[in-house]
Design a protein with these regions (language model features):
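Bacterial N-terminal signal peptides
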Residues: 10-20
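Bacterial N-terminal signal peptides that target proteins for export
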Residues: 1-12
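Short, solvent-exposed coil/turn segments
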Residues: 93-95, 240, 353
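Active-site core of glycosidic bond-cleaving carbohydrate-active enzymes
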Residues: 247-253, 257-506
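Short helix-loop boundary/capping segments at the starts of domains
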Residues: 16, 230-233, 277, 281
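Extracellular/oxidizing-compartment recognition motifs
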Residues: 24-234, 250, 266-268, 310, ...
């Protein structure tokens, strides 16, 4: 008897269901796949070096041969015939080394494809990753932070290890542009068929774009977009080398970039979910009261950009609980006791009075956004409570103490006239006193005052200066005062010049 078409389709679907559920998973692993396997959501690509920055081939210049083959794109397969290989040799007293430039800041590691060697045993090498030539040449000091030394506290960048005679090996997980390889094994010769950087990234389209008649400004825009793109790992990091953590304050300018360049991306809601799980109330986000304020601002901006009411409702209890937590720490006279430590960003930390004024403005901003969130959630009592907190905070408005971070927040929140804020401090000295985190809010203050040309000039001066020094992504910290007599990051530092990364960076 012939089965009815609908029944036949149902039986076929039932039979095929297990195969569909485990599609792409080897049969041997399928029984445990749901319990122990997590799919890697990131993409990988292999990148050939763009140039050889320096090499040490011994006093007779004979320890390295045919290094130009490393600049050719390979197929990733090892070979034992030693054809088209870079040959590196060491003696008792001299060790060959190469320093490679991959052209742009990357996140990932390194892949060595071997072409055999003079030893049956593995050979000892030292591999140093660097965001600058200076860092790739530097010595590590992990016991204490010292100028001119590098650290491995967030991502291992200085690795001494054995590599195989044949085959291939992958090393590292960090942020870098440069790699130095030293052959430490005495009296050994190794053949390197390929040295490739492993780029680990999200394969997503650039939906937003910016183009004008100022090519420097165009390059600044795309560099900012790429900087954030690299930080979009499984979660949204503050940086690909350090700290590699979801910081709720650093997230805000990243969120604004993502929404304009990439549109909706799950890295934002996933990171906000993770933050709430890591720091349940009454804990402060990242252990910092200021970053709980940024959480509310981030929630508002994400809803404003996406209209995702379901995600907002998912966080309604946390939002309400945080509003009530803050309310209990602001008295009727406008005095607040959220936490003993006040924080805006690291460059401003020395100006205690200015930070205090800016921190209070940040509370007002967070409550303004929390008011809107509460209305969207239909929680009118919380919405009114936010207004009450704002009114109490406005009873005690402190001076900015010539701190650009503070004046910018005060202008954004309406605690200070934007034009006055710009005239008194934000515009003074142009890009001097700007920072890589709070520079966004300084530009917002300039825009509120209608100072658009001034803002563009500062963008070209401050962010453009990093490009002039060889940056391919923007740095965690930067100050225009560092520029005089500074060497670029993409060449060895000459004697008498400042190492802008080693002397000032991390």
């Amino acid at each position: 008897m012939e089965l009815l078409p609908a029944i036949r389709k149902s039986i076929i679907a039932f039979v095929l269901l297990p195969a569909l559920l485990y599609a792409g998973i080897p049969p041997t692993l399928q029984s445990d796949a749901s319990q122990r396997m997590t799919k890697d959501i990131m993409n990988r690509a292999y990148i050939t070096p763009k140039r050889i920055v320096t090499k040490y081939a011994g006093c007779k210049n004979n320890l390295i041969k045919d290094e130009h083959y490393l600049l050719e794109r390979g197929n990733g397969q090892s070979e034992m015939n030693r054809k088209k290989c870079c040959i590196m040799t060491s003696t008792e007293t001299e060790k060959a080394s190469l320093l490679l430039d991959f052209g742009s800041e990357l996140h990932g590691g390194l892949k060595l494809v071997m072409g055999s060697s003079s030893r049956r045993e593995p050979s000892l090498v030292r591999i140093r990753f660097g965001e600058s030539v200076g860092e790739a040449n530097s010595t590590t000091s992990n016991s204490e932070w010292k100028v001119g030394f590098s650290t491995d506290d967030h991502a291992k960048r200085d690795i001494i290890m054995e590599i195989p005679r044949d085959g291939m090996i992958e090393i590292g997980n960090t942020g870098f542009r440069f790699v130095r390889l030293d052959l430490l094994q005495n009296n050994a010769t190794i053949s390197l068929k390929e040295i490739s950087a492993i780029l680990r990234y999200r394969d997503i389209p650039y939906l937003g774009s910016f183009e004008c008649n100022d090519q420097r400004l165009n390059k600044i825009w795309i560099t900012g977009a790429y900087t954030v793109h690299l930080n979009m790992q499984e979660f949204l990091w503050d940086g690909i080398k350090r700290d590699r953590v979801v910081w709720l304050g650093d997230m805000h300018p990243e969120l604004m970039t993502i929404s304009r360049v990439f549109g909706y991306n799950e890295v934002i809601p996933n990171s906000l979910d993770l933050a709430c799980k890591q720091f349940p109330l009454p804990d402060w986000m990242n252990g910092m009261s200021a970053y709980s304020l940024w959480y509310l601002i981030n929630q508002y901006e994400w809803y404003h950009q996406t209209g995702d009411i379901d995600f907002l409702k998912k966080h309604s209890d946390y939002i309400s609980g945080l509003i009530h937590l803050i309310n209990g720490k602001v008295d009727d006279a406008g005095n607040e006791t959220l936490a003993p430590a006040r924080f805006l960003d690291w460059p401003s930390s020395g100006n205690k009075a200015g930070v205090e004024a800016g921190y209070r403005a940040l509370i007002v901003w967070a409550m303004q956004d929390a008011h809107q969130l509460s209305l969207k959630l239909g929680n009118t009592s919380d919405a009114q409570l936010c207004l009450d907190i704002i009114n109490r905070m406005k009873k005690k408005i402190l001076p900015h103490n010539n701190l650009k971070q503070a004046a910018s927040l005060m202008a954004i929140t309406g605690l200070m006239d934007p034009q006055q804020a710009c005239d008194e401090v934000v515009s003074v000295g142009g890009g001097k006193g700007f920072s890589t985190f709070y520079g966004y809010y300084m530009l917002e203050a300039l825009a509120k005052a209608g100072e658009y040309e001034k803002a563009i000039d500062i963008i070209n001066t401050f962010w453009g200066a990093m490009l002039d020094l060889g940056a391919t992504t923007f740095w965690e910290d930067f100050n225009l005062d560092w520029i005089p007599n500074a060497a670029p990051i993409d060449e060895p530092v000459p004697a008498g010049k400042k190492d802008i990364h080693g002397d000032f960076g991390a």
